[in-house]
């Protein structure tokens, strides 16, 4: 979102890290915004019959303060992407490489010939050596990188540095911090089970996220991680963080077909989603996360 990035630049942030999709052109957009140049930012719209853009003009929000361009770290999963985007018009300043066990969303396993993703006996995606970045290749690129996914400890940091990384990205541990948005009673239950040595069963759910990407789910009794609880919950999309834009056709008052763009979410009420052109199979197992 250009408005969010521009606001962050006005606040003087030092670093922007991003990985949703492939944000290859963000460094260029930040440079253009610092120079007060207007931007046509392409928007991904499902079922689009034309190209869509968000027009952003920094002059509209200009302040007296000169803006500097933050450093940009691109979150990726593969050394192949690092090789590719190091040569980009305005390359990133570094990379964050996420392993398949990283929390939150994960890239799906790479499958030859676009075959369907294989699942293990528990229903989790099967990751192989193809899904891990080659550290020898990363070292050879002479670009700083950080590692993520199972590195959130003193030992993990040492392991990452031994692999040539500048440091690590940690996220899951902060979900248990005082400032996190997790419900306090759930947070305390997780902390308690970790302290007691029981640990938490974390499951890579291929269906939970409305985006369709695998998503890490902590299995806790009484939460939507349990199928029975999920089935009893009302479907809802009240925040819209993971909505997608979609082009739909409707009949206007004049009786003519028209096209418009709507926002939809595969975790919203099914009838609403279908009315916006969504497919029923995309709603199976989807949760508001």
Sequence positions of predicted segments:
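Conserved active-site-proximal phosphate/metal-binding subdomains
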Residues: 92, 97-144, 152-154, 162-289
